[in-house]
Amino acid sequence: IRLYDPTAGEILFDGKDISKIKSKADMQAFRRDVQMIFQDPYASLNPRMKVNDIIAEGIDVNGLAKTPKEREEKVNELLKTVGLNPSHSTRYPHEFSGGQRQRIGIARALAVNPRFIICDEPISALDVSIQAQVVNLLQDLQKEQGLTYLFIAHDLSMVKHISDRIGVMHSGKLLEMGTSDDVYNFGVHPYTESLLSAIPL
């Protein structure tokens, strides 16, 4: 999403190289289509902002609410969508658990109606008891809203559970790619084999 510029290669979205986007309007349109859920739900939410302002940031930037009432309604609906209570909107991030904070991060990503969401290790910082809940929420949202995820993870059992296609990367290089079943059952690269052999039985 151009938080960093690439040093080599291309990143294509809808057939366009995003590293060549120059105008502010084009970048804003791209960022409406592509959102991100960050790994650390503690560091990725501004501790000085209330939840309603965190979630509504994208709504405000893109002019998606015409009145304060419409803004509030959108935020409340997003909170309900991710399993939180609208009354939580006036609280600060420190008042929530890790799992709840990650739900706030998911609501923030959904606020601009994206088509593609990058999930950067979205459950690795959470308690094991909460991880499945967040993954189930992501899967439900995918079905309901027709979302596409790029799910970055090192937990291969979770990757198999959530993925249609898997790409195995090492040192910045894509080693192999295929359907979830193909990579798990017929992965040919030695690095893939070493990852698969490390999964607990």
Locate the predicted segments by residue.
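Conserved ABC ATPase signature
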Residues: 92-96, 100
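A short, proline-enriched helix->beta-strand linker immediately N-terminal to the Walker B motif
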Residues: 111-115
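ABC ATPase "signature
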Residues: 174-178, 186
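Hydrophobic anchor residue at the start of the ABC signature
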Residues: 106, 134
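ABC ATPase NBD coupling module
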Residues: 18-35, 61, 68, 182-187
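Conserved ABC ATPase "signature" region
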Residues: 17, 63, 69-87, 196-197
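A short, surface-exposed alpha-helical micro-motif characterized by mixed small hydrophobic
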Residues: 159-161
